[in-house]
């Protein structure tokens, strides 16, 4: 195969996506768009918080713009260590490890902790980074029906022949905004003794008395073996982290996870901003109360919206083309929303993903509901 025949093959594959509205492009976002942004994950609007910006600037003065090395060489700084310790204390764990991204953290954890002879039971709607890591591990991977604790129990009953069993779930799912039944999974762990890996990416900042997530709110922190969180959503910075009760998990990942080892480390300024965000979130419980109030207000007024209290509200269209038209109509009305289509979601489940945030007012949501009702008329 020559480069020209490869180019033809690539173009052909791309053209196959256009008729169904599945061809994707990236658009450079302007600093000022005039739109109310309901597409990103900055749920507490911390990305522009003065405390985070101040912390990042002070770190830039000390460390410069880059960590300049991988963490095992010299990229791991006092700032990264301080963030790990703060995150662990905040969420009720003993040990922490900072990663460059949520994808790297999930993929790194799931590709090296399980191995051949082990079984991974993973929720069917778990993030792609978790599924990809699990498939790379060499372990047997079985996906159970979304949020189906009964099926999970059935699979656990039949899991005795495996050396180790891992259960992998999220606390709040990114496309539907629904919650896992963490207490029921914790009860299963007490019976079966599996290793539980929980991704709290979309729950951080929104749940818990201290804002550390749904595990805190549900009182199941002690049952979790690996807690995965992100610094780039509600915490308004960049990167991710994993938390553990046992130091051997941290040490093993430092030694065996290529995603951690073979890359220039997260800039210290991002770690500093994240540390400031944790301090802010823990002190500002009223923001979480207001966020939940907004979620309830919007769901009550939007016909057909799913029950829940997370900041994520899907509006299902089914096919991609009408969903893309609806997104354009909402932009004209002053709202930027995320257009989600296969393969991110299953075929026939294309949707607008509306991400609420605490900078919104009820009047904003009233206008959004009116615009959506016009679309569906």
Task: Put a short name on every predicted segment.
Residues 2-65, 194:
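N-terminal "arm"/small-domain region of PLP-dependent enzymes with the aminotransferase-like
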Residues 109-128, 149:
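Conserved PLP-anchoring active-site segment centered on the Schiff-base-forming lysine
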Residues 192-195, 202, 207-309:
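Active-site C-terminal subdomain of aminotransferase-like
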Residues 142, 146-198:
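Active-site phosphate-binding strand-loop segment of PLP-dependent enzymes
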Residues 100-103, 121-137:
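Substrate-binding/gating loop at the entrance of the active-site cleft, primarily
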Residues 46-47, 289-334, 344, 348-349, ...:
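Conserved PLP-binding catalytic core of the aspartate aminotransferase-like
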Residues 50, 54, 58, 62, ...:
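PLP-dependent enzyme catalytic core of the Aspartate aminotransferase-like
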Residues 54, 59-101:
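Conserved N-terminal alpha-helix of the aminotransferase class I/II PLP-enzyme fold
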